[in-house]
Amino acid sequence: MTIRIAINGFGRIGRSVLRALYESGRRAEITVVAINELASAEGMAHLLKYDSSHGRFSWDVRQECDQLYVGDDDIRLLHQVEIQQLPWRELSVDIVLDCSGVYGSREDGEAHLAAGAKKVLFSHPGTTDLDATVVFGVNHDRLESGHRIVSNASCTTNCIIPVIKLLDDAFGIENGTVTTIHSSMNDQPVIDAYHHDLRRTRAASQSIIPVDTKLSAGITRIFPQFVDRFEAISVRVPTINVTAIDLSVSVRKAVNVNEINALLQKSAHESFRGIVDYTELPLVSADFNHDPHSAIVDGTQTRVSGQHLIKTLVWCDNEWGFANRMLDTTRAMAACGF
């Protein structure tokens, strides 16, 4: 049975989800019946077709009034501010993928359900009272039919959690720190402008900018055993896509670089195939643009100090990889039944 979805919010993630659906060949399984976005229909179609990070969309895109056509598929375009007014019941929507970045509470999810959707998947961590927070490949098998309001966590959580799991299962993590080296985002100005975070008043293209991150909370939401044992910081850098994560963990078992890389490489081809990738090529961030994996381990950067302190570097396309996981989680939610 085809899963009928609606996308609420057609920004970076919303558009990536739609493109990934068509480019990954999953169109036969999932149908987009509607997109809700306050921007103009013309602007929505234009930014779907032409993208500064991901290039031109290979499918034919047309827009007529409030209808978007992708190939032979027609998608209804909505411009509704209030969730409760969205026609999810009329459109027989199975799952709403809320990619707005604005909504993420249980109350927001219940508003989608009241409008007629059967389930809701948020594209960011959301509040802690949701039915489930999923990092696909790690805990998606714990989804149940009663989980109606779900979070897909964050792009950085999806990147680092599989690697943490692999290292913990093999070597026993005591504690760790994470530094996210993240591409600039749309909450940063092109030139200096006012923002409540004074660092984010500064031009995105001119500085490396420290910003707040909730990644440590994201880690402990998935792995509560690490409460008070992981800390994270984040900096934004002047690139428009792809993120690197510097992970340092102390482990109980004595270990060397070859053992770590062998584990991560084997897992990329077996238990985490399609989720984690591994490379020892001399690559840079641009080479991981449009990569569908949640995480790509750079084996050339693995280090060990004193046999118990591990440092790894993990790449991800923070848009494209996450968009593909949104689709994976959508399928997993549907497989549990409605």
Swiss-Prot record:
The keyword NAD applies. Transmembrane segments: none annotated. NAD(+) binds at residues 12-13, 318. Signal peptide: none annotated. GO terms for biological process: pyridoxal phosphate biosynthetic process; pyridoxine biosynthetic process. Its EC number is 1.2.1.72. GO terms for cellular component: cytoplasm. Pfam families: Gp_dh_C, Gp_dh_N. Homotetramer. Belongs to the glyceraldehyde-3-phosphate dehydrogenase family. Epd subfamily. This is D-erythrose-4-phosphate dehydrogenase. It comes from Pectobacterium atrosepticum (strain SCRI 1043 / ATCC BAA-672) (Erwinia carotovora subsp. atroseptica).
